Regions:
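Long, compositionally biased intrinsically disordered regulatory segments in eukaryotic proteins
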Residues: 1-118
Length: 118
């Protein structure tokens, strides 16, 4: 599923939303860390936390904790911000930074806003 920036004006199914989220994670990790480190992150998450890439949308809290363990809280928050900005852009949503929010909070908000689309 290829979506262009700000293209989604319609409600996405949960499966399509999940694919868009994983795509945003892929692109963001590549952008921030590079392809080799992205692959290492996925391998580490799968082998040490039993989180395969395709389960990230359903296990977002565990994914976020895995990033925090791998990189520390502050760097993982920066990575999460890149991911969420990319996801919001793909969904045509406006990103508003909230100091106490983590990646799962933003994704929950995006899911709610997606469900409200017709």
């Amino acid at each position: 599923m290829q979506q262009q920036k700000g293209e989604s004006a319609r409600h996405l199914s949960e499966a399509d939303f999940g694919r868009l989220l994983v795509e945003s994670v892929d692109e963001s990790l590549d952008c921030v860390l590079g392809e080799i480190v992205r692959k290492a992150v996925y391998d580490t998450l799968e082998n040490h936390s039993s989180i395969p890439k395709n389960q990230i949308p359903k296990r977002l809290d565990d994914f976020t904790l895995g990033l925090e363990r791998a990189f520390g809280v502050v760097p993982s928050k920066t990575i999460g911000k890149v991911i969420i900005k990319r996801l919001y852009s793909k969904l045509g949503l406006e990103y508003v930074e909230r100091a106490d929010w983590r990646l799962p909070d933003y994704v929950r908000e995006a899911r709610i806003k997606n469900e409200r689309k017709e």
